[in-house]
Regions:
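RecA-like P-loop NTPase motor core
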Residues: 1-52, 57
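Residues that form generic nucleotide/phosphate-binding pockets
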Residues: 2, 49, 111, 115, ...
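Short, flexible coil/linker elements and helix-boundary hinge sites characteristic
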Residues: 5-8, 52-57, 94, 124, ...
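Glycine-rich, often proline-containing surface loops adjacent to acidic residues and nearby aromatics
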Residues: 57-69
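Activity-critical C-terminal alpha-helical subdomain
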Residues: 67-168
Length: 218
């Protein structure tokens, strides 16, 4: 089943076409990343509805927080760094809430581009609007054309970025790698070179086994 709670919409959208999987997509009350902790009650209330009304197994589910690193929408690097280190596991974070922060540089459109472009991780954009403009100029890059083959290409771009930046990583314990990515990307942006195109969304697919990584690539 698929359950969706959009920002500023009172109702939930539910689809039961796939009875073998359960996915819930929830917007924070505001689009800014600080809403993760500043509006905790809102998310807690949504989780309660999912548990009680839709029998969604929140406590046994992988939780991911997807946000853009676009410096115009998320302006507090120190807070982002804090979330990278504390939201480090989709299931359990000791004394902190469950969930893994997945950043895209500069925005989630990076994942879409990486589905359709080889060496996409060498493209550079400063803002999410730049990535959207690139997509608008390349009409073959379309979300409805994403397939198993294109997702594998995106996964390869994910891995190639890590290799090219010499970032050691463990798929199940990715916090240190995520922090290294953030540090390198911030330095690139502050030097005026923009962000290298990169999305951590692939990490979720690897952690959940939707995409499997060959041993020789690790």
């Amino acid at each position: 089943s698929y359950i969706e709670k959009r920002r500023n919409r009172p109702t939930y959208f539910v689809s039961i076409q796939d009875r073998f999987s359960q996915i819930a997509v929830v917007n924070t009350r505001e689009s800014n990343i600080r809403d993760i902790s500043e509006n905790e009650k809102y998310l807690d209330d949504v989780f309660d509805v999912l548990r009680e009304q839709y029998k969604f197994p929140i406590d046994q589910s992988a939780i991911y927080y997807l946000f853009d690193r676009d410096p115009k929408s998320n302006t507090d690097p120190a807070l982002i760094e804090k979330y990278i280190l504390s939201l480090a596991n989709p299931y359990d974070n000791n004394d902190y809430k469950a969930g893994q922060l997945l950043l895209s540089y500069p925005s989630i459109e990076s994942y879409l581009v990486s589905n359709f472009r080889d060496a996409a991780n060498f493209l550079r954009f400063s803002l999410g609007t730049d990535a959207k403009k690139y997509i608008g100029q390349n009409t073959d890059i379309q979300i409805n054309k994403i397939s198993e083959e294109t997702m594998i290409n995106a996964a390869d771009e994910f891995l190639q970025y890590l290799v090219s930046e010499r970032i050691a990583f463990n798929i199940d314990e990715f916090s240190e790698a995520g922090h290294a990515i953030f540090t390198k990307q911030e330095a690139e942006y502050l030097a005026g070179r923009g962000f290298r195109l990169f999305s951590m969304l692939t990490l979720a697919f690897l952690q959940m086994g939707i995409i499997e990584m060959e041993e020789k690539l690790q």
